[in-house]
């Protein structure tokens, strides 16, 4: 009987030791004076940051590496992000997004409506998923506004542009 108690205590002790040995503490090391690099620890990540190549763009936006014109808040409502506001025509074929001023890309370049237009056009050229969201005829810049001209009405255009496929890249 004493032999069984010793075995149980030994087994429990080994189980605890194995459990605690599997936990580790990790700490990023780097030059505290460096302002050019950030280290992020993640459990998984896409093998590319290109939003049109794989459907891992949600990861990119989740880690705050890229942003869209609109986004969903914690209640699932569409709210402004890189666009300050938006409006649409009565027929639902023309959508105007006012592009936020004072935004910089990670390389320090200012984000302009022309750059946003080029980013959306790039996405439309590279991804065959764009028609699943909207039927784009053309894009036009008017001051701080980016105007989407659609071939068919789309009542959810602001929601479509919250999808990370439409991350604004420079």
Say what each PLM segment does.
Residues 33-37, 64, 81-83, 90-94, ...:
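Extracytoplasmic
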Residues 41-90, 121, 133:
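N-terminal lobe/hinge region of extracytoplasmic solute-binding protein
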Residues 45-48, 76, 102-104, 153-156:
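Solvent-exposed loop/turn segments at secondary-structure junctions
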């Amino acid at each position: 009987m004493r032999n069984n108690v010793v075995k149980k205590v030994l087994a429990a002790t080994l189980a605890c030791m194995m459990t605690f040995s599997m936990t580790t503490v990790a700490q990023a090391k780097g030059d505290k004076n460096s302002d050019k690099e950030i280290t992020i620890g993640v459990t998984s990540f896409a093998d590319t940051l290109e939003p049109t190549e794989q459907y891992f763009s949600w990861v990119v936006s989740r880690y705050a590496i890229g942003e869209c014109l609109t986004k969903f808040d914690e209640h699932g409502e569409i709210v402004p992000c890189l666009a300050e506001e938006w409006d649409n025509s009565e027929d639902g074929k023309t959508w105007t997004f006012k592009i936020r001023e004072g935004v910089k890309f990670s390389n320090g370049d200012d984000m302009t409506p022309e750059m946003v237009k080029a980013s959306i056009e790039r996405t439309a050229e590279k991804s065959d998923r764009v028609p699943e969201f909207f039927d784009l005829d053309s894009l036009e810049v008017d001051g701080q506004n980016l105007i989407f001209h659609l071939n068919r009405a789309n009542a959810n255009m602001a929601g479509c542009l919250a999808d990370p496929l439409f991350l604004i890249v420079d």
